[in-house]
Amino acid sequence: MDRAEKREFVAWLNGAFKESGSVVVAHYTGLTVAQMSDLRSKMRDAGGAVKVAKNRLAKIALQGTESEGIADLFTGQTVVAYANDPITAPKVAVEFAKANDKLVILGGAMGATTLNADGVKSLASLPSLDELRAKLVGMIQTPAQRLAVLTSAPAGQIARVIGAHARKNEAA
């Protein structure tokens, strides 16, 4: 990689760090190519990305971003996972690390908040933004449905009483 390519890569990685909701840094020593490809595909399917970058270039790319505090984590063979949704990257990385003990989570960042490995694992246990939205919609819809049932029930009862009264008058 020559200097121009490095500059271009750093600019691209800087943009990725600025746009991401969360960043996870992990050691990947000992992962096979197949395992790394599996991690990349799982992250891509979830809406994130995985990148192996030279530590020096990653530290330069972090400058000027909210995630600048995680620069110390870039030692050894590191991989960076990031996604726009703050929960996606930690969730996929932690699930993959459970199945593959060669992936060791070092820490990460969510916005300006620097996270250690336990913080990333805690973040991974939270529901995703889409799941939270679905729960919120469910909470809003349930009372509205109950209200509709309650308001329509008296009208139905009145109609039955009037119908019974009309049948009684016809019979008499």
Curated annotation (Swiss-Prot):
One of its GO terms (cellular component) is large ribosomal subunit. SUPFAM superfamilies: Ribosomal protein L10-like. The keyword RNA-binding applies. Gene3D superfamilies: 3.30.70.1730, 6.10.250.290. Coiled coil: none annotated. GO terms for biological process: translation. One of its GO terms (molecular function) is structural constituent of ribosome. Keywords: Ribonucleoprotein, Ribosomal protein, RNA-binding, rRNA-binding. InterPro entries: Ribosomal_uL10, Ribosomal_uL10-like_sf, Ribosomal_uL10_bac, Ribosomal_uL10_bac_type, Ribosomal_uL10_CS_bac. It holds the Pfam family Ribosomal_L10. CDD domains: Ribosomal_L10 (cd05797). Forms part of the ribosomal stalk, playing a central role in the interaction of the ribosome with GTP-bound translation factors. PANTHER family: 39S RIBOSOMAL PROTEIN L10, MITOCHONDRIAL (PTHR11560). Belongs to the universal ribosomal protein uL10 family. Part of the ribosomal stalk of the 50S ribosomal subunit. The N-terminus interacts with L11 and the large rRNA to form the base of the stalk. The C-terminus forms an elongated spine to which L12 dimers bind in a sequential fashion forming a multimeric L10(L12)X complex. This is Large ribosomal subunit protein uL10.
